[in-house]
């Protein structure tokens, strides 16, 4: 189901973004878990798209294992939901390990979950 587009909806989005805190726990697990729980349908093949720029968590392996537990494979080995990701090259002053960790994490999640990872390498 699509969210209805209207001037008030757009205004609400802009106002929400004004107070948005750009720093978070940078973990995709909660969003993926919610998306799989909310949208999984055994009669449909759906995809989740994850957009991000860094990963600050302690363990990539823990995230991969958590998503493996959430996004189960069927009898044929296909995952319930395909996971695709886009990585943005956001550097505050210079490249840092968090951006590369995000790319490594999402590349592995996309691979394991029948998806595609696109890592953007420069600003346009």
Predicted regions and their residues:
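Gly/Pro- and small hydrophobic-enriched strand-loop and loop-to-helix capping segments
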Residues: 45, 115-124
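VWA/integrin I-like adhesion module and closely mimicked acidic/polar interface patches used
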Residues: 19-20, 54-112, 118-120
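Long, low-complexity, Ser/Thr/Pro- and Asp/Glu-rich intrinsically disordered
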Residues: 7-10, 29-33, 37, 63-65, ...
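Von Willebrand factor
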Residues: 8-46, 57-58, 87-92
């Amino acid at each position: 189901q699509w969210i209805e587009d209207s001037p008030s909806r757009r205004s609400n989005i802009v106002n929400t973004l004004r107070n948005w805190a750009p720093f978070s726990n940078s973990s995709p697990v909660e969003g993926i878990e919610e998306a799989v729980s909310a949208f999984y349908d055994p009669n449909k093949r759906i995809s989740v798209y994850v957009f991000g720029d860094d990963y600050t968590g302690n363990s990539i392996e823990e995230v991969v294992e958590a998503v493996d537990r959430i996004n189960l494979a069927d009898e044929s080995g296909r995952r319930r939901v395909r996971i695709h990701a886009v990585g943005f090259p956001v550097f505050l002053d210079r490249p840092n390990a968090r951006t590369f960790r995000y790319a490594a994490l999402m590349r592995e999640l996309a691979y394991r979950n029948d998806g595609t990872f696109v890592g953007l390498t420069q600003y346009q």
